[in-house]
């Protein structure tokens, strides 16, 4: 845990994707200068999937790795004795786990930021391998294809080399294979978009506000669009970031943090909203893609003047 729970404010809960841990997945975002205001006012709990932390020892022979459902069920016992509610930020497998957690504990989750979320049950390994030029049994290569587009794999060599070395050297390979196996054999979330005035109270879907984030060249684009089609449109915004690949919280952190910052602020104290929304400023300057109208209507930004000036002056 980073910081301590403050009054009745929700705790920010993060969960990483396969091949990563909380450091490689979220350090760039939470260490970004303008995110420091968030970390000053909210406690942040970073969760690593079993055995995925750096330097983790291998599991004993015969160990049964938890399923995705079991990892979601493990969350309350790990931290909820100290907090009243959470705002979840998850990437890939972590976004799936936090979605399960929200479906099972709707009163505990105030909102979700889901990056590269896939609600479907189809195995990602076959899909990822099909994106490569030829079949490979190398787990690192398959995970790289899961995270990055073909263009990124060839054009952004510095980023690719950094993550390839991290996945291959910092994460225990046996433990990683077990985590990947659990994600590969996940079940469908079985969520569906409610029909207003007809089945809102009975349909299985996320009841909290959700911000779905994906880069426009990410391998996860189709999956995130599918997830968006299954959620309540009055509580969900799909943000497809322009000129961005598989890890928007890393490669476009100067823009991504604004949406995360704004979303968290709205959820924590909606009564303090101001009318100026910096996203209008960004869109007019051509720096950000236009998010859906739901974002402008439902989630304006707190202290918009200061955020807009910060972001406009940032060198991205």
Model-derived regions, located:
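Conserved HGGG/HGGXW glycine-rich cap/lid loop of the alpha/beta-hydrolase fold
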Residues: 1-60
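Conserved acidic catalytic loop of the alpha/beta-hydrolase fold
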Residues: 68-87
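Residue in the alpha/beta-hydrolase core beta-strand immediately N-terminal to the catalytic nucleophile
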Residues: 86-89, 111-113
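Catalytic nucleophile loop
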Residues: 94-95, 257
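Flexible "cap/lid" loop of the alpha/beta hydrolase fold
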Residues: 96-142
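Conserved serine/cysteine hydrolase catalytic core
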Residues: 171-240, 249, 283-291, 296-308, ...
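Post-His helix in hydrolase/transferase enzymes
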Residues: 249-271, 282-288, 296
């Amino acid at each position: 845990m980073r910081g301590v729970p403050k009054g009745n404010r929700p705790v920010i809960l993060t969960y990483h994707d396969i091949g990563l841990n909380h450091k490689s997945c979220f350090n760039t975002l939470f260490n970004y200068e303008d995110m420091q205001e968030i970390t000053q006012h909210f406690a942040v709990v970073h969760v690593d999937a079993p055995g995925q932390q750096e330097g983790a020892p291998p599991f004993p022979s015969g160990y049964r790795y938890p399923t995705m459902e079991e990892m979601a069920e493990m969350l309350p016992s790990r931290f909820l004795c100290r907090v009243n509610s959470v705002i979840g930020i998850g990437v890939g497998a972590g976004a799936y786990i936090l979605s399960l957690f929200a479906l099972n504990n709707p009163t505990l989750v105030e909102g979700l930021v889901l990056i590269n979320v896939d609600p479907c049950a189809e195995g990602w390994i076959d899909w990822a391998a099909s994106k490569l030029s030829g079949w490979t049994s190398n787990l690192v290569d398959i995970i790289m294809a899961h995270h990055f587009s073909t263009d990124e794999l060839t054009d952004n060599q510095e980023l690719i080399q950094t993550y390839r070395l991290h996945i291959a050297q910092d994460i225990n390979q046996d433990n990683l294979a077990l985590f990947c196996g659990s994600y590969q054999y996940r079940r469908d979330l079985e969520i569906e978009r409610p029909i207003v005035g007809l089945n809102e109270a009975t349909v299985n879907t996320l009841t909290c506000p959700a911000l779905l984030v994906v880069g426009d060249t990410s391998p996860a684009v189709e999956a995130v669009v599918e997830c968006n089609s299954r959620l309540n449109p009055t509580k969900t915004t799909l943000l497809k970031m322009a000129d961005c690949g598989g890890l928007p919280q890393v490669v476009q952190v100067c823009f991504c943090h604004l949406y995360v910052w704004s979303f968290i602020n709205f959820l924590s104290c909606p009564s303090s909203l101001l009318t100026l929304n910096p996203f209008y400023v960004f869109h007019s300057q051509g720096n950000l893609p236009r998010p859906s109208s739901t974002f402008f209507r439902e989630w304006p930004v707190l202290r918009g003047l200061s955020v807009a000036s910060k972001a406009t002056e940032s060198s991205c």
